[in-house]
Amino acid sequence: MKYPYSFEVLTNGKLVMRLPQEIKLMETFLGVEVSAFGDWILEEIHSVLNGKENYVVVNGNICGLEIRKDTTTVLDNLAEDGKGDFCEIETIELVDLIHIWQDKQKEFKKGKNKELK
């Protein structure tokens, strides 16, 4: 994994993933979009990685993705100026982060990790 990450439980009991500033928008993407549509998003990413599609655009509630084989751009769909915050991440790193987030969420929901180390 190229990017360091950690997990935090907020005072409201919600689990969040913390990431470096250059991919900070990924925190929102994982917490909102992947939490709701993770399997579908992974299918779309794999359709590009497997060569079925050259390029795929995915739009969620807050974030959008422009998926290419090498890199994916994560966009803030709620930006008032039409562009807003965005970050670029290697597509394979994105897949890894999604899997890490999904695994941690499942573990957390089972009650094994109400307090993180």
Curated annotation (Swiss-Prot):
Function: Immunity component of an LXG toxin-immunity module. Neutralizes the RNase activity of cognate toxin BC_0920. Probably does not have immunity protein activity on other toxins with the LXG domain.
Chief localization: cytoplasm
Subcellular location(s) of the protein: Cytoplasm
GO cellular component: cytoplasm
Tagged with keyword Cytoplasm: yes
Subunit and partners: Probably interacts with cognate toxin BC_0920 but not with other non-cognate toxins. The interaction inhibits the toxic activity of BC_0920.
Name by which UniProt lists this protein: Immunity protein BC_0921
Cytoplasm recorded as keyword: yes
Lineage: Bacteria, Bacillati, Bacillota, Bacilli, Bacillales
Record keywords: Cytoplasm
Species in which this protein is naturally found: Bacillus cereus (strain ATCC 14579 / DSM 31 / CCUG 7414 / JCM 2152 / NBRC 15305 / NCIMB 9373 / NCTC 2599 / NRRL B-3711)
